[in-house]
Amino acid sequence: IMVSKKKIKLDRRKIALCMIGSSIMAFGLYNVHSLSGVTEGGILGMTLLLNYWLDLSPAITGFIMNAACYLVGWKLLGWSFILYSTIAGFTFSASYAVFEQFPRLWPGLADMPLTAAIVGALFIGIGAGLCVRAGGAPSGDDALAMSICRVTKSDIRIPYLASDLLVLALSLSYLDLKRIAVSLLTVVLSGQLIGFVQNARVPQAEG
């Protein structure tokens, strides 16, 4: 697939990874993560903080912060990053809209926050990991983490963990310790999974 006069070439396999990963994320967020009662690290968690502290709408602050992260990503990672991210973001929204038409598969998870946090992290970690592996970012958090890695040459799990820990620590200003602990488990596990999926080696077929 050729895009623009610069002839940016998109890999069909990477497009497929972005679409599959985003769909997995949407499935997990709708059927599991939304039932866990946990907060978030990263940009989503920061929008909740700003809403609590300054009464600013997450719709506004989320848009501004995500746009800023994607702008940084574009500057450091190029147009192919933006195109793969657009595919990932569109697929996520479309998939979530489809899943919303059906009842949640495991409503009982609402009474098992620890289990929901772990299972939800699996969906988020694997889904986002596939997108990042393909070179796209389904959210501003992913764009920021990928940009930091490009500059520092560090493992992608480090910026995920750092931003999540910072936001969760600040969230103690309005959330109880138990909820923060469950949230910490979710973001740490999902961040580690993203790094694992991104770096996993796929065996080459012989022949």
Identify the meaning behind each predicted range:
Residues V3-G207:
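Core subunits and conserved enzymes of cellular information-processing
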